Amino acid sequence: EISSLEKACEITDNCFQYILTYIKPGMTERQIADEIEEYYKKRTEGLSFETIVASGENTSKPHAVPTDRKIQENDIITIDMGCKVNGYCSDMTRTFFVGSVPEYIKPVYDLVLKNQVQTLEQMKDGISTRLLTKMVENDFKLNGYDLIHSLGHGVGMEIHEAPYVSYRSDTQ
């Protein structure tokens, strides 16, 4: 089980590395999603869920559907994707930029990154996932933003499995 999960995550990470070299201004979100699907078809049992590729203003939607919006220079892109290996799922989300990071986005990007690093450092046996989420939510509010999604979840044979890292869960 663990080796299948590790393999699925390794392939997904490799797909991210590949797709970063593939994306060019002028491509559509849908073209990128199709390329990800082709990548997985050659290496795995297929997608563990429908790939999300969101760019520009679409990145503000947690579960965006790929559109015909064209990627522009200095665009922000969020990709949420995963595959299945021996029935076990991967699920990774990454946000990056095509070109340079626009100055107006840097504070938000840095806030998210800071909270990701701090949350990973705080994760240990006995800490409540609700508390972890509350810490991030409080920091977002202090900086003028709302937390509009959970922080994460486990994976396995299902794409969403315990532990759930959200204010709705009190897993430790």
Give the ranges of each region predicted by the language model:
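Active-site neighborhoods and metal-handling regions in enzymes and metal-associated proteins
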Residues: 1-172
